Amino acid sequence: IIHSHNYLMSFFLLKKTDIFTVHDGLYYQSGAVNHKLQNLFKYIEKKVYKKSGLVHFISKFAKEKSLYRGDNFKIIYNTTPFEKIDLKYSSKVNWETDKIKIFTVRSIEERANIDLLIELAKRKRNYDIKVAGKGPLLEKYREEIRKNQLENIELLGYIPDEEVRKFYETADLVTVLAKYGEGFGLPIIEGYLYNKPVFASDICAIPEIIIDKNFLVKNNAEDLESKIEKYYEELPVYNFKKYYEENFSYDRILEKYRQMYDKFFKI
């Protein structure tokens, strides 16, 4: 079986792609940034679907924003390998112990809305914000943090999985912010795996994945701050880990993949 996640690879592949997985529609993504080759990407996306035996989407949102109009598709959410991989922690993570500890994992690019976290750090000095991930805007944002003399937010850059897991375990909450192009929101379920509240932007596939609409935020620092403060004032009872296990656990998602492959073999 040829199972591809890459539009260009499948487009240039001489053989037919048996199963093609869509994270974000190519045409939708290019439109979000007004790419000059948007019409070419539209052609490529449609061509790839025609060459694919079965199309798999990681969310309903990904399906809605795609150019796929056929009936031979499956929607299966993501899971996280952190559930099954037993890693040893080689180092400690440094938090300000008297502050609310906020962790996020993002690619440091325009759509990740790092500006919002920097603004939050300016407003709330009692928050300790750690951002893991690399990307083209990493140094730009680090310089902005230095210029504003913000000691309560740190861009960690790339860190190994064992450190990512340790940050998840020791954080008080997780944020997942986005301006566009969020076909699923993997850090949301990673936060739930470690039984953490996750506050995330009210866009794209995120409302599908979030445990409750009370954790959805508008893309401004005021609303994010308000939602976090309200949570700590009321301390509502949620079992985030159970929500993960019932909807995104490795075994549940693996079974759905098995069913998808069974469907393919029956075509």
Which residues does each predicted region cover?
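Short alpha-helical donor nucleotide-sugar binding micro-motif in glycosyltransferases
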Residues: 158-159, 166-171, 257
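Conserved donor-binding/catalytic core segment of Leloir-type glycosyltransferases
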Residues: 56, 94-112, 118-122, 129-130
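Short His-centered aromatic/hydrophobic patch
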Residues: 4-9
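A charged, aromatic-enriched C-terminal amphipathic alpha-helix characteristic of glycosyltransferases
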Residues: 233-266
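Short hydrophobic beta-strand element within catalytic cores of glycosyltransferases
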Residues: 188, 197-200
